[in-house]
Amino acid sequence: MSKRVSAFGAEGDDEPQEKPMKPFISFSSNINNNNNSNNNNNNNNNNNNNNNNNNNKNNIGTGINLNIKNNNNINNNNNKSGFPVKKSRFNGEDDDDDYFFSNVPPKSSMTTLNKSPPNFENASSNNNNNNNNNNQESDSKNQNEDEDDEIDPLDAFMENVNAQAAIDNSKSIEKGQQQQQSLKSKRDDIDNEDDEEIFYKLRQKQLANKSSKQQQDDDVDYSSLDDDDGYFDDEESLKNGQSKGKRIIEPLPPIDHSKEEYIEFNKIFYEEHPDIANLTEEQVFEIRKNLDIRMTGTDLINPVTSFGHYGFDDILLQAIAKQSIETPTPIQKQAIPIALSGRDLIAIAKTGSGKTATFIWPSISHIMDQPYLEKGDGPIALFLAPTRELAHQIYLETLKYSKYFKLKTTVLYGGVSKQQQCKELKAGCEIIVATPGRLIDMIKLKATKLNRVSYLVLDEADKMFDFGFGPQVLSIVNHVRPDRQTLLFSATFKPNVEEFARTILSDPIKISIGMIGSANSDITQIVQVLKSDSDKWNWLTNQLALLLSQGSVLIFVSTKVAVEQLSSNLTKFGFQTCTLHGDKNQIERSQTIQTFKEGKINILIATDVAARGLDIPLIKNVVNYDTSRDIESHTHRIGRTGRAGNTGVAYTLITPKDIHFSVDLIKNLESASQFVPPELIDVAMNNPHFKRERGGGGGGSNRGRGRGGGGVGYRRNSRGGGVAFNSNRDSSRSDSQNKFIPAQSVEGGRLFNPNNTDNSEINNENEKSINNENKFSNNNSGSSNDRNSINYRNNSFNNNSNNTNNSGNSNFNNSNSNNGYSNNNYNNNYKNNSNYNNSNNNNNSYYNNNNSNNNNNSNYNNSSNNNNNNNNNYRNGNNNNNYNNNNYYNNNNSNNNSSNNNNSNNNSSNNNFNNNFNNNNNNNDNSNFNRALPFNDFNNNNNNSNNNNFNYNNNFNNSYNANNSNHYKNNNNSNNFNQRSQYNRR
C-alpha cells in the first residue's frame, strides 16, 4: 500500500517538498460523526452515537489534516452534491485517511474563515452543502435544502489553506537550510573545543612554561628534541592545528598473567666449546683482564675468543662474514655466551663497541627455535630504544641478518603513519624495533600484542628512564610473559637507573667493558684551548678543508639557532652543509641523514639529537664546536666516529668559560690514555675542587701539602710526589664506590699514562723476575717510564719531553741488551720458562707474559712488520707507527731509531720468537697450547710437528691476510667441534 505524499513531505521523507500537491476533496468512509439516532444513511465504520447531538463532522482531503466542526444540523438522507459519499477517491484506504485526518487542527467556527471569493483551481468539485434543519416532529422525514450559492465557506477555507501551505512550505525550506548550516558550524565548534585537544593544549602550555624556566632554546634536553613518539605525529599535529609538543603517554593497564596461556619455549642455545671449557680460572681471569671486562653475578660464563666458539649456524656465520667482521669485540666475546645461555644481562660498554650485534645475533637463534607465528600473534623478539634515530639504526642492522632467515622485522616510532604501521603489524612480524610511546599506541589500537614476546632488549636503557619513559617501559615489560629473557645495553648506567633496571630482571649478570662512561680508545681526542668563542670560527675555517680531505665531518653545537647560524656562515664561506636538530620533522631528518650518508654533502651540523643512533662509516672527524652539557653526551658525540673497530679523530674546542666541563674532560681523556694539554689543565684549575685534588703543592697528604713534585691524579698517597691512575679495582664493589689507587710517577712529572701504569702493576703481580725498569720499558716499547710513554705519543705538543724520551730509549736498549732479547716480553719469558714442555704451565706462562705488554691483542699485530696496522701501532707506540710520519708526532724519529737499533742488535724479535718457540716444542703436545691462544681461529690444524708450529707463527705474523671464509671454516675444522645443523623450526 503506497503512502500519500503531503505538501510538506510524507512520513519518512528526508526533506520537505518544494511544491504542494493539488488539493482534493474526499468524503472518506473514515469519518468520526456525532449523529442523531435518526441518521439513516451513515455508512461510517466508526460511529459515536449521541442522542442529544446532531452534528456532522465533515472530512476534507486537501493533503493536509483537517478537523472542521459544523454547528449546523445536517440531514444526511439525501446528498445533492453529485459526489459519491461511500466510495473514496483512493478506494477506501481507511487507514491512510484516518492517519492523515486524525491530526487535523480543530477550527472554532466557519464564520472565522476568510470571506474572499473561493479559488476552485485546485479543487475537483464542490462537495459542501448547507442544509437547513426543519425542526419538524420526530416522525417526519428530514429534507435537504438547496446549496447556498452566494459564499461557500469551504472554498474560502481552502483558499486560506493553500496560501498558508505555501507560506509554511517556504518557511520549512528556509528553516532546513538554517539547520544544516547550524549543524555544520556546530561540528566545527566541537572540533575546536574537543576535550582531549583542550587537555593537550593545556599540558603543552604547562610544559612550555616549565621548559622556559629551565632552558632557553637548548637542544641538549632530549625530552624536547627527539620527538621520540612521546610526541604528536606530524600528521596529527597538522590535523589538529597544533604545534609540536610533548604528548602525555598513558602506560598500559596491568595484566593478569595467570589468565594468559603462553606456549613453552627454550632459551638456552649455548654449548661451551672444548677450548673454552678447558681454560683454567687463571686463564679466564687473564682473558677478562686483557679485554678490560668486569663482571658481577652468579654462575659466571667464560668469555670466548672467536666466532667458532659461539656455535652459530653456518648461515649466520656467513652473514657475519659478509659484513667484513673478522673478530668479535670485547663485549661480544663475553655478552653473547651469556645471551645464548638464556640469562638476563646488564651490559655496559662504550659507544661503537658492537652492542647492537651483541643482542641481534642471539635473537635469531632464539626465534628460529620457536614455532611459526599464527594469525593474531605478536612478535617473538622486542627491541626498545629511546629515540627514533636509534630505533631506525637498530632496524637497519637487524635486517642485515634477519633477511637470510626470512624473519619479518618492523620498526615503530613517531612521525610515521599509524595506518601503515598497523597494516604491517597485523600481517605478522617476528621482530619489532620500537620506541615506547608508539608501541603503546599500537597495542591500544589492538594492532599487536605481546603474547609471544620471550626475548626483550632495552637499548640505551638509562636514557629511556632519563627521558621519563620509566612508567611506560615498566608497563610494557609487565605485559611480557614473566619467564622472558631480558637484556639491557647502554654506554652509561647510573646507579639509580641500575637499581630500577634490576626490578625487571631475574638474577642478571652485569658486565662492563672499560671504565663506565669512558671514551673509545680507538678515537683520538684532540683538545684545542682557545681564548674566546670568536677564535672557534677562525680555527674551523682554517682546518675544515683538511678535515674534509679525510672524510665526512660532523660538527656539534649546543642550540638550534647556532646550527642554522653556523650553517649559513659556512655556506657563505663556500662550504655545502646540511643540518639536523629538534625542529626538523621526521621526513626532513630522514632526508638529511640519507644525503649525508650517501656522501652528497660532507658536512653535517647538528645538536645532540644526532649524538645517538647515527652510524655512518664515512664520518672520520667529529668537531665539538660547542661543548656538551655533560661528559656522557660528549662520549656519545665522539662515538659517531671510530665505530666497530675503525679509527677516528674528535676535536673539542674549549674556552676559558668551560671550567666545569674541563674537569670531566680531563678524566675522560685519561681513562682512554689520551693526551691532556697543559692549557686544559690550566682551565680546570679554576675549579676549586679540582685544584684541591690536583693543585700545585704535591703531596704528603690528602690536602695536597708536603714535599715532592706536584702532579695530577685522582688521589694522593702518603708517599708524596705525583700520582698516577690505577684501574685495578675490586669488582665486588659497586662502580660508584670504586676509588682510584694512586701510584708514584717520576719526579716533577705532570702527566701520566693510566693504561701503562695499570699494566706495570699487573707485571708486579705476575712477573717478579723482571725489574721495574724493564717492565716500564717493555710496556712502552721504547720508553723507560710512564711519563716517557705519554711523551713518546705526544711529544709534538711538548718538546721538552723528547730529551727525556730519548733517555728512556737508551735505558730500554741497555735493558734489552742485558737480557739478550728484543722488546717483546714473551721472548724473555719463553727463554726463562723451565716448565715450557708442560702444556698447563705453558698456558699460564703465555698469559702472564702477555700481561706485561701494553695491549695483548695488539702486541701480536705490532710484532708483525707485515701487518702495517698503523692505527693500532700508534696506540701502542710501535716502530711502524703511521703517525710518526705525521706533523703531530714528527719528533719521535729519534725514538724509532733507537728502537730499530735495538731490534738489529737482537737479530729481529720475530725470528727470535720463532726459534725459541720451535726449540722448546720437542715432545710437547702443542694442541693444548694453541687452544689457549685467543688467535687460534687462524690455526689450520693442530699437529705436533715443528713445521706446523713454524707455519702457525707465519700465520700469526700475517693473520689479517686470511680471508673471512677461511677464518671461520679453519677454526671449525681445527677444533672438530660438532656444530649444530641448520635451524629446523618446529
Curated annotation (Swiss-Prot):
State the source organism's domain of life: Eukaryota
Q: Where is the Helicase C-terminal domain?
A: 522-684
Q: Name one GO cellular component term.
A: nucleus
Q: Which keywords does UniProt give here?
A: ATP-binding, Helicase, Hydrolase, Nucleotide-binding, Nucleus, RNA-binding
Biased composition regions of type Polar residues, renumbered to the chain: 105-117
Q: Where is this motif: Q motif?
A: 305-333
Name the enzyme's class.
hydrolase
- What residue spans carry the Acidic residues bias annotation? 217-236
Q: Which Pfam families match?
A: DEAD, Helicase_C
Q: Which reaction does it catalyse?
A: ATP + H2O = ADP + phosphate + H(+)
Gene3D superfamilies xrefs: P-loop containing nucleotide triphosphate hydrolases
The UniProt annotation puts the region (Disordered) at: 1-149, 165-192, 206-252, 688-986
Q: Which residues bind ATP?
A: 349-356
Q: Where is this motif: DEAD box?
A: 459-462
Q: Where does the UniProt annotation locate this protein?
A: Nucleus
Q: Where is the composition biased (Low complexity)?
A: 29-82, 119-137, 753-764, 771-978
PANTHER family in UniProt = ATP-DEPENDENT RNA HELICASE DBP3 (PTHR47958)
Q: What is this protein called?
A: Probable ATP-dependent RNA helicase ddx42
Upper classification of the organism: Eukaryota, Amoebozoa, Evosea, Eumycetozoa, Dictyostelia
Source gene?
ddx42
